A protein has these predicted regions:
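Non-transmembrane, aqueous-exposed alpha-helical and coiled segments at domain scale
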Residues: 1-206
Length: 206
């Protein structure tokens, strides 16, 4: 579908992240095994990179199980969600971005595509309510980031939260192949290794 394609395209590339570096460094050591380099990069996808999609979806499903309708105003549910995360000293998944403030420009476009294709109901609305409550309580700019938007839209699809990270794995595999192609044409892995060896490795012992 158009919406699913938009999700995948959004997740393909995220710059020179730890997973991209892992892929590049592995390829530098084993250029005959492209698949190993991609696999090394994919192992770095977790709760910090890509994994907040599943965290956001899980949070929304816990508030409104799939197939059910909200039993309370979404604003009240959002207050409970934010209060629970603050009490447990947890970050609300899907909110905040180090660069994109006050809005992650990918989010409104994803929500627009979802709405145009009939995939914008109470999960998207609850995610937006959670953002408003989190900003109100913290006094900080906490935009819904792309992975938060994707988590909400994936919940609208009805995908089980446990497999939603898989969409990021699938998409990022494409991006890592692109990084390896770039590594072939314009290498950086060996330079990174040598700089780390020089700057953090200490005196060499022969």
């Amino acid at each position: 579908s158009v919406t699913f394609n938009a999700i995948v395209v959004t997740l393909v590339e995220h710059g020179v992240t730890p997973s991209a570096l892992a892929a590049r460094l592995t390829y530098a050591g084993a250029p005959e095994a492209l698949q190993a380099a991609v696999a090394a990069g994919l192992c770095g996808l977790g709760t910090v990179f890509v994994g907040s999609t599943e965290g956001a979806a899980k949070m929304l499903y816990e508030a409104i199980p799939f197939g059910e309708k909200p039993t309370r105003p979404l604003a009240d549910m959002a207050k409970d969600i934010v209060a629970d995360h603050r009490a447990r000293k947890l970050i609300v998944p899907g909110l905040g971005h180090p660069l994109h403030k006050p809005i992650d420009p990918r989010t409104p476009r994803l929500f627009q595509i979802a709405a145009e294709n009939g995939l914008s109901s109470h999960y998207v609305a609850l995610m937006q309510a959670v953002q408003e409550e989190a900003e109100r309580v913290s006094g900080k700019s906490l935009p819904i980031n792309a992975t938060g938007a994707i988590g909400a839209i994936a919940a609208e699809f009805g995908f089980p939260w446990k497999i939603i990270r898989g969409f990021g794995v699938m998409a990022r595999a494409i991006g890592l192949v692109g990084h390896i192609l770039e590594e072939i044409d314009d290498p950086m892995a060996i330079e990174i290794w040598q700089r780390v060896e020089k700057e953090a490795g200490g005196p060499r012992q022969d």
